[in-house]
């Protein structure tokens, strides 16, 4: 399944949501490198989300130039930054993170965690903007660039989620992708699939889609939008 097929075939039904998750996860497991990566993430608790999400990233990355720019808000221990680097060795990859337990995570040396993950898989280290996504200095620094993909998985309160979508969606290039985690309460997911965080879903639904963004598809609790103008 390529991106065009995913967009065409997506439906908001329990059966469709279950199929997408199963097909995407199977694709990851068919690729030894991606399977080993996700297995390591799960074994060492270096990230959450679904195995299927890695294939979502591959579908988006396949549509972009090799040196595309990627920004993640909310890095945790680096799972997504590492996956994107594995799929796109020449990409320009940046993460925004306070490198602390902010948001309810356990205490850890998050800078060392991110380095360990990338070293383990012989991946080039990402650029890190240290701070909160709502910090003026962080916004100014991140806003010096425009990005082919912005991934929002930061603070899970209504206020922070709405701020992140409002601010960072403006940094996406026309034709680029805005990907948001934990925001699928409006969808008819099958029993057992996590819809995300209700406050995050509310914030996203109030802002998207709009005249600048069209929704393409979702996978479990992640939604994918494309900037159209």
In which residue ranges do the predicted regions lie?
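Long, compositionally biased, charged low-complexity segments
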Residues: 10, 14-20
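S-adenosylmethionine/decaboxylated-SAM
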Residues: 3-10, 24-48, 54-229
